Amino acid sequence: MTGGGTGGHVNPAIAIAETIKLNIPGSEIAFVGTPRGIENKLVRAAGYELYHVDVRGLRRSLSFANIKAAYLALTSPGHAKKIIKSFKPDIVIGTGGYVSWPVLRAAASLGIPSMIHESNAYPGVTTRMLARHVDTILLNFEKTAEYLKPLHPKKMVLVGNPLRSGFFASSEKTASASAGVSDAKEGYQKMILSYGGSLGAQHINEAVLAMMRDYTKYHPEILHILAAGSIEWEDANKMFDAYGLRGYPNLRLVEYIYDMPRRMAAADLVICRAGAMTVSEIAAMR
């Protein structure tokens, strides 16, 4: 499995691995990610071995960092090839993020079956780059095929988005019995979840922190959690303190919500970005 950089790339890979393990208990699964991405926490927490390939995205502005990114784009497939030769997989599956490029490119060059999953309606850069190299392109939206079909019509399969099993609790009552979701509210009458993805979203953080300051701090019966994201974490903490919110036990600022299925099943309101995986998770819950 390969996919990294954000939760939107890592979590579907974990969901696929989870399903493979369920159907083929004796299967061996390893992940390849970057040294810096959230996969280093999520993959290891899920109990899988994680290899590293250093690869970085190009910045749109002129930057010396682009020189290193270009160098890594050229050298990373060789590193990925060594990992693949060592692990000897029967198939390599990617779920996006820059790290999928060298790993799937290396797999294709070695003649190992490969596929990439695209969760968005418009395919990302990595999917477009790999489309002619991989054996199969898995799609969440039928419309995505319009952007790839002229060149790769026989490769595409409409499958939807892979979700971790915890998201298929159809109601709070059902989820409470199966996964202890009732504890997620910690005794509060209502719960609000707010998040802008694993990296964070500045405007969502600012709006939600203002909401905490002006509304939820006056409602101690409401548990309000904001996951600020890794990039926005420092700024969100400064604003949290500036608004004097640190002393309210019902107001929580965290970097990432690691028990999202449990929390989401118990939530009365979710405020979030409309990322493809996030929308799929909410749809599965409701």
What is the predicted function of each stretch?
Residues 79-92, 100-115, 128-133:
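Glycosyltransferases and closely related glycan-assembly transferases
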Residues 94-95, 260-286:
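A donor-sugar binding/catalytic signature common to diverse glycosyltransferases
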Residues 9-20:
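Short amphipathic alpha-helix
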Residues 42, 46, 173-174, 180-270:
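Donor-nucleotide binding loops and adjacent catalytic segments primarily
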Residues 1-6, 23-75, 159, 230-231:
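Conserved nucleotide-sugar phosphate-binding/catalytic loop shared by glycosyltransferases and other
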Residues 28, 49, 108-173, 182:
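Active-site-proximal region of nucleotide-activated glycan assembly enzymes
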Residues 39, 73, 80, 126-127, ...:
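Acidic, amphipathic alpha-helical patches
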